[in-house]
Amino acid sequence: MCGIVGLFLKDKALEPQLGSLLTDMLITMTDRGPDSAGIAVYGAPQAGHAKLTIQSDNAAQDFDGLAERLSSELGAPVTLTRKDTHAVLDFPADKASETRATLERIAPGVRVMSAGESIEIYKEVGLPKDVAARFEISKMSGTHGIGHTRMATESAVTTMGAHPFNTGS
C-alpha cells in the first residue's frame, strides 16, 4: 500500500508555494505509507546547467570537499548545496556524463537520486512529515512536484526502495 500525490501549477504566482502545498498533500497520505517518503520537485532550469541530486549515509564524510574535487577533476565549476543526507550538485550541462562518471569514481559511497536540468529528488526512511521537514520541502518553489509515501510489503524499508525514481535527464 502506498500514497501518491502530484501537483502541476498553472499559475506562476503559486510557484513559490509549491513545496508547502506538496508537503501538506504528502502528509495527508501518511496512513497509506508510513515507512518512507520521497518528493520530486521540478524547478526552473538554469540555462547551460545540469544537476545531480545525490544521497549518502555518511554525508559529512562524502560531501565535504566533493564540489572542489569534482571541479578540479572536470576543470569546470561545480557547486554543492547540502540538505541533510542529500546534496544537489550544479555543473555545466555539457559536463553531465563526465560529472557522473567522475562522481562514481571518486565517491563510490554516494548514490544518485536524480539527474536533469530541473528535477531534484529527496527521499528517506521515516514518516512523510519527518522526511519533508529534513529536506525543508515546504520552502521549495517550482512548477510541479510528485510525492510518494511507502508502506513496504514485499521488500525492505530502505532509502533506495523509496519512490519516486528518476530514469535520467
Residue ranges and their predicted role:
Residues 1-169:
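N-terminal glutamine amidotransferase
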